[in-house]
Amino acid sequence: MKNQWNNILSIGEKVLNGEKITADEALTLSKSNGSDIFLLCSFANKLREKFNGNHVDLCSVINAKSGNCSEDCAFCAQSAHHKANVSCYPLLNEDKILEMAKQREAYGARHCDIATSGLGYTGDEKDFQTILKAFKKMKENTNLKLCACLGTLTEKAMNSLAAVGVERYNHNLETAKSFYKNIVSTHGYDERIKTINYAKNAKMEVCSGMIVGLGETMEQRIEHALLLRDLNVDAVPVNILNPVKGTKLENAKPLSPMEIIKTFAIIRFILPDKIIRYAGGREKNLRSLQPLGFLSGLNGMLIGNYLTTNGQSVNDDFNMLKDLELEY
């Protein structure tokens, strides 16, 4: 135990001094168990405080087009390859999207993300033009920071989003490259990375994260986090698998709450100065331990409902942040 304490403290001091940790050092941190996990989390919280202060970045998502997706992501209720009981509907019109954006601004979101099912867009589609109009109306009628989650895009499509005021693009890699083939077969990992690079070239912030609990190892979570560091993304949403009946992963074994908390902390050690965001699955998987996420290095949160599952009440989220004396 004492040796692991020393490992945590020495690696943590290295990060505090502005140095990057190695894959081997991250693996050393992952050996923390029992009370060592709380020291690991405490140091991750110290890193969050030093590099990011006490502000929590809040965002919300609009599921603007749901279901009937051509892709076969094993976790996703919206895939046409699955038999999940999920609401399916075509793209909402721009006025409906604006109405939903105003609702999210009213309940406290600072960023609003328009998300659509499907592989992505080239920039010429009628639906994509509707999305551009929706963003223009949001820019004119709200104070929200505009975000998009539209799948893989061409450079042309990405530049069109930037031109109407979209400031952040969300494109999750989902898992490590070494595990990806177990989760998706209909499009490749490099396609996703190309989209991230298009967003960076368009001078957008990039939000790219992961789902934990897909069957990956801790080593693969570390592999993924190190790649996100290399890609220099701005924000990392961490989803925890919430298995949906009818999907390939409906019977996946859930991670233990302490394994999840330890994962948050290690990601903070790897990405000390980034937004690391609570995303889907926290309510089901962590239950009463949700506040521990913010004591383990998190500094962002998706509030309200998710794409196909419900989140806890916004008031409960705000009360949690107030109790932790965090700003938002």
UniProtKB/Swiss-Prot annotation:
Catalytic activity: (4R,5S)-dethiobiotin + (sulfur carrier)-SH + 2 reduced [2Fe-2S]-[ferredoxin] + 2 S-adenosyl-L-methionine = (sulfur carrier)-H + biotin + 2 5'-deoxyadenosine + 2 L-methionine + 2 oxidized [2Fe-2S]-[ferredoxin]
Keywords: 2Fe-2S, 4Fe-4S, Biotin biosynthesis, Iron, Iron-sulfur, Metal-binding, S-adenosyl-L-methionine, Transferase
Enzyme class: transferase
Signal peptide start and end residues: none
GO MF term set: 2 iron, 2 sulfur cluster binding; 4 iron, 4 sulfur cluster binding; biotin synthase activity; iron ion binding
Domain Radical SAM core: start-end pairs: 51-282
Essential cofactor(s): [4Fe-4S] cluster; [2Fe-2S] cluster
Pfam families: BATS (PF06968), Radical_SAM (PF04055)
Binding site for [4Fe-4S] cluster: 69, 73, 76
Free-text comment on the cofactor: Binds 1 [4Fe-4S] cluster. The cluster is coordinated with 3 cysteines and an exchangeable S-adenosyl-L-methionine. Binds 1 [2Fe-2S] cluster. The cluster is coordinated with 3 cysteines and 1 arginine.
Binding positions for [2Fe-2S] cluster per the UniProt entry: 112, 147, 207, 277
Pathway: Cofactor biosynthesis; biotin biosynthesis; biotin from 7,8-diaminononanoate: step 2/2
NCBIfam families per UniProt: bioB
Protein purpose: Catalyzes the conversion of dethiobiotin (DTB) to biotin by the insertion of a sulfur atom into dethiobiotin via a radical-based mechanism.
HAMAP family, per database record: BioB
Subunit (UniProt): Homodimer.
Family the UniProt entry places it in: Belongs to the radical SAM superfamily. Biotin synthase family.
PANTHER family, per database record: BIOTIN SYNTHASE (PTHR22976), BIOTIN SYNTHASE, MITOCHONDRIAL (PTHR22976:SF2)
Official protein name in the record: Biotin synthase
Species name: Clostridium acetobutylicum (strain ATCC 824 / DSM 792 / JCM 1419 / IAM 19013 / LMG 5710 / NBRC 13948 / NRRL B-527 / VKM B-1787 / 2291 / W)
